[in-house]
Amino acid sequence: DVKFPETENNSHRKIVSLDKSWRVKFTHTNADSITSLIPETKVSLPNNLDDYYGYRQLKHGNLHGSAVYQRSINVEKREEKRYFLELQGVETYATLIVNGYRYPKELVGRTVFTEDITQHLHNGDNELSIEVDHPEYIKDSPWVCGGCSSEWGFSEGSQPFGIYRPVSL
């Protein structure tokens, strides 16, 4: 397990960890013959869906594709407050869906991404989904897959796939 520093709770802002109670399911991958056999799985974050770390010494052994993470959250919504979802690391693109509202797809990578979800959050139970896309041969991100590089062994096996850092509200 990876441990991250505890958040300060003595400020005016309340930060709630959403790292527990996720369900994840592959939607498609470059290894569909293997990943299609994997049922929806319960996970905690951080979570790397690609367990290949270069040990097979392949030029391109990385897993690419899409998956969806889902969970319910219960919120005591107060009208005078704003609610932000913070993703600290998703490889490579993330699409947030809050109670059926689909936010635009964002390049997240190894940066922190924050979205104001106040307008689509309800008092009480809410459904949250994060669609994760990690395609092959990425050209619009500084964090490319080493296996997709034309250079042999360039960071091969080092690219995570999924939500690999904390998520908070």
Question: What positions do the PLM features span?
Answer:
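Extended carbohydrate-recognition surfaces in non-catalytic/accessory domains of CAZymes
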Residues: 1-88, 143-166
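Beta-strand-rich ligand-recognition modules
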Residues: 3-5, 97-149
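Short, solvent-exposed aromatic-acidic interface loops
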Residues: 91-92
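Residues within well-ordered beta-strands of beta-sheet-rich folds
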Residues: 70-74, 82-86, 95-97, 116, ...
